């Protein structure tokens, strides 16, 4: 009589290892320490080979983290649009966006500010634009392509954030958020009674 094999649960170890690596990046960034693979591995309590088994390099790690963050921000945006004004929604989402870049500033400055690779920057922009597309499909005026609008918002926002990350005298996060809000298209943040403030 044939036996039916019970499907195995996914191995939880890679998820735990990835979580330890992400947490290590956050701790290193909070202390202002250099974020390198050896530093991350030591902080996470894993070997360098274990790091590389999970992430190709620091760029891949940053792209993975930001892709998840952009997904969370888009979900927040779409849920708030049902009950909040456009400017309230934009304030909440830009606050979350800037807070993420501040939390892992050292990693993102190294990846997005690198003059040696633009692959990570393109991947981050593409992930941002992909997640912004849902909002753009709901908000763009007639005649505008939502995909183009999503690329525009993602590219412009990342330009502001990258300049802030690389600044020798960075502005407070509240100022960065205000700059982002002021640069967003009016049709995205205003209704009949709101103005960006």
Where are these regions (language model features)?
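Hydrophobic alpha-helical connector segments
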Residues: 78-107
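Helix-turn-helix
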Residues: 28-60
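Short, hydrophobic secondary-structure boundary micro-motifs
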Residues: 109-111, 173
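Short, residue-level hotspots on alpha-helical faces of the histone-fold
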Residues: 23, 64, 68, 114, ...
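Basic, helix-initiating cap at the start of DNA-binding domains
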Residues: 1-34, 39
